[in-house]
Amino acid sequence: MILKITNLFLKIIIIIFCFNVKAFSVFQPNQLPFIEYLPINRDIINEENINTALKLQENRFYILYSYQNMKIRDNIECNEIKKENYIENINYLIIELKKYSSSFFNNINFNYLVLCQSLKLNSILTAGIPSNNVATLIFDISLNKDILARSLHHEIFHMMKQNKDYKSFNDKYSKINDKEFEYGGCPLCSESIDISFNNNIDGFVTEYSKNTVEEDQAEVFAAVMSMTNFDIYFSNNKKVLLKKKIIYDFFKKINKE
């Protein structure tokens, strides 16, 4: 009897321990807490996207999700998601990821896409937080579908340019602007947070683009990758078309197989 009670007690201890290992686990490659791999099965991923998801994994690109609210350092917060609630958005993202070559993500040191909701940086809502240092993009999967794709491509462009000096590239790009123009300098400080694509802003695809050269470039890239009629829509905006050529040429060099 004592032996049975002891065994039962040990089983309870093991169950509690295993639960706590998950609850307080840290994903070692990027040191993020409370995340795990998104299952590649037909409960979550549509039939037409299964092969794409598997191919991404074969090339060391993984989609993960937050199963518990997480706080990173003192300035990043993101809430858990119930993956079943975001099936449509998850599949939409996979379709967008298919636009990149099989070697692209390794070329920019991007291996982990972490999905969560209500992502905040310094208490301000943001679509994504990229970090090449840990090959990770934390991304808000709860965004409205109409801005989901462009937000993903915007953040991917930031990852394309991290950890290298692009001063000459930025200078060449900035020369397309009017000589008198100066970027605002602080995306989160400015009142120019309108991210609607607009073909009547001379040299820019959105008002938000006017904040920094990096945001300008990321917005152009996001527009190119998410719009099916970019050239037609911006045909009246010569400077935007010139910027597109610079950005797309830069992208093609990285996106080659």
Regions found by a protein language model. Name each.
Residues 1-26:
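Classical Sec-dependent N-terminal signal peptides that target proteins to the secretory pathway
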Residues 2-8, 105, 207-210:
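A general structural signal for short secondary-structure junctions and capping/turn motifs
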Residues 70-132, 141:
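Auxiliary, metal-adjacent structural segments of Zn-dependent hydrolase domains
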Residues 15-17, 70, 210:
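Residues at the start of alpha-helices and the adjacent loop-to-helix junctions
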Residues 7, 92, 211-215:
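Residue-level recognition of hydrophobic positions within alpha-helical transmembrane segments
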Residues 20-95, 223, 247-257:
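N-terminal low-structure segments adjacent to metalloprotease catalytic domains
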Residues 36, 61-66, 85, 99, ...:
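Intrinsically disordered, low-complexity N-terminal regions enriched in serine/proline/glycine
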Residues 112-257:
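Active-site-flanking segments in enzyme catalytic domains
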